[in-house]
Regions:
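Terminal, regulation- and interaction-focused segments at domain boundaries
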Residues: 1-32
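Intrinsically disordered, low-complexity segments enriched in small/polar residues
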Residues: 4, 10, 43-44, 58
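Short, Lys/Arg-enriched charge-dense amphipathic segments
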Residues: 17-26, 52-65
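Short secondary-structure junctions
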Residues: 26-38, 91, 95
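A cross-family detector of function-defining hotspots
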Residues: 33-50
Length: 95
């Protein structure tokens, strides 16, 4: 099993940023097993080749700390999934 992960901060609420992560997963055709509507801190989805997860917590007014992880038998597949989900999460507010 190969794992890829990264941490970063974005401007926006936990909920709104996780919705962006979920949208990025759905955009890749992933089945979302734990949608944002079922929880308030994590979204998870994947397919037969990869599992991706985005976890978030608030670090201040309109700022969120995120961890995006992906797991696959193939390191390249895990890396691509992590990057795709991460890149789908944009700053929602200008500083």
């Amino acid at each position: 099993m190969n794992a890829q992960w990264g941490t970063f901060r974005r401007k926006g609420s936990v909920h709104d940023l996780l919705v962006e992560a979920e949208d990025a997963m759905r955009g890749q055709g992933y089945q979302v097993a734990n949608p944002v509507s079922n929880n308030n801190s994590m979204v998870m989805g994947g397919n037969d080749s990869v599992l991706a997860q985005a976890t978030a917590t608030s670090t201040g007014p309109e700022e969120t700390y995120l961890i995006v992880s992906a797991f696959s038998q193939d390191a390249s597949t895990a890396e691509q999934a992590r990057n795709t989900v991460r890149d789908g999460i944009k700053d929602l507010y200008n500083l």
